[in-house]
Each structure stands twice: as C-alpha cells, then as structure tokens.
Regions:
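Nucleotide/pyrophosphate-binding catalytic subdomain
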Residues: 1-200, 224-225
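A conserved active-site cap/scaffold subdomain adjacent to cofactor or substrate pockets
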Residues: 186-218, 222, 229-230
Length: 230
C-alpha cells in the first residue's frame, strides 16, 4: 500500500507539480496505541496521550518518504511541529491557530516532496497536540489553505461522495459535484467521508477539495462545486 501511494505521488511530481502529502497512521495503529494507554490507566493524562498517539503518523511519514526516495523522488518527512502547525492547548481535540510555511516552501522550491504527519501540531509551550479523530483531513486542508494550493485531494476507502454509505447501502448513488453546504450537512449528520472540522476549514478558506479512492488510480472523485467557483 505504501509503495502504491509513492507511485501515485511520483506521477504528480513527474508532471511538474509541487506536492505535499499528509498521512495518517496505518490502519488500526491509533486504536492500538490508545489500548496501550488504557492498559495503564482508564483516565490517561491528555497531554501524555497526545504525545503517545502522535507517534503513529510519524512511522507512516518515514515509511512513505523512504518509499519515495527508493523510486527516485526526493522526499522529506516532517512532523506537525517541524512543519509549523501551531495549535491551542486543548489536548486530544486541539484547533489549528497558525501555520508557518517557511520550511515547506524551502523544500518545495528545492524540488522535494514533503510528507507531513497529519492529526498533530504543537502548542505555545511546545507540547505535542492532536486534532481529534479524522484530524489528518483537517491537517491536509489547513496546509492547502496556508500554501494557497490549487487543490486538496482527500483519499478515502470509497471512490468519492455518496448519498449514503455504499458499504451499508449498495444502492447508494455517487455524487460528482456537491456544494459546501451539502457536504457540511452530510458531515454533521455523521458522514465519515470527511471530518466536519476539515469541511468547515475548507469553506472558510475556500480550499478546492476533491474526494478520491485510495484504491482507484483513474477515478476523478467528487468535487466541491462551491470551492471551484472561487
């Protein structure tokens, strides 16, 4: 799976695009880390919990960077702290306050692909913070906004946005275009395609979003029409 992602990133890079990849932990890893914490205490300290669960993404960014370098793409892995994602101090559910783009711009201008640990940042005291479940979506949208990216692509385990969960309802219809208000409503009603905070962030900063399948290389996904108009 990591090598498949690397090959997809390489295609974009080879076409001359500046690419920032935001990744989450491997499937099941965050739950495994949470279980380890709960084995120690039923009420783990939120600061220590963030310090612990943020390591899942750090493993993934290193693996993807290794994979990219192995196929001839210069890549650099960066944690939320290293990439300059500053948050408040609400451990386990922090909100992004600002992003320093200097480090990213330096690497992008040098022709490198940046692989960023999603779901995490740091507060004013230098503590590691996490953004809550699905926070990697928010990280990706926030970085796209900060860099004024042409588009933010969100890869999921379904090939776009559906009227309902296609894994539960086989007759669910795929939506090619969707307004911001509709996407926000779906997220607020429990749609697992995007984290609601990431949708709010995208609307606020007018980030063009495209939802794509992690398994389908040829699918165009669903595009948020509101964003394209700006």
């Amino acid at each position: 799976r990591i090598l498949n992602v690397a090959r997809r990133v390489k295609r974009w890079h080879d076409h001359g695009h500046k690419v920032v990849v935001v990744v989450s932990a491997m499937s099941g890893e965050t739950n495994r880390l949470l279980a380890l914490a709960k084995a120690i205490t039923e009420t783990p300290d939120p600061r220590e919990l963030d310090q612990m669960v943020s390591t899942g993404e750090q493993v993934t960014i290193s693996m993807l960077s290794m994979a990219l370098n192995s196929i001839g793409v210069a890549a650099k892995s960066l944690t939320g702290r290293q990439v300059g994602i500053k948050t408040d101090s609400a451990f386990t559910k922090a909100r992004i306050e600002s992003i320093d783009t200097d480090v990213m711009t330096e690497h992008l201008d040098a022709g490198r692909v940046i692989v960023v640990a999603g779901f995490q940042g740091f507060d004013a005291d230098g503590n590691t913070t996490t953004l809550g479940r699905g926070g990697s979506d928010t990280s990706g949208v926030a970085l796209a906004a900060a860099l004024k990216a042409d588009e933010c692509q969100i890869y999921t385990d379904v090939d776009g946005v559906y009227t309902t969960d296609p894994r539960v309802a086989p007759k669910a219809k795929k939506v090619d275009r969707i307004s911001f208000e509709e996407m926000l409503e779906m997220a607020s009603l429990g749609s697992k395609v995007l984290q609601i905070r990431s949708v709010e962030f995208a609307g606020k900063y007018q980030v063009p979003l495209r939802v794509l399948s992690s398994f389908d290389n040829d699918n165009d996904g669903a595009f948020d029409e509101d964003f394209k108009q700006n």
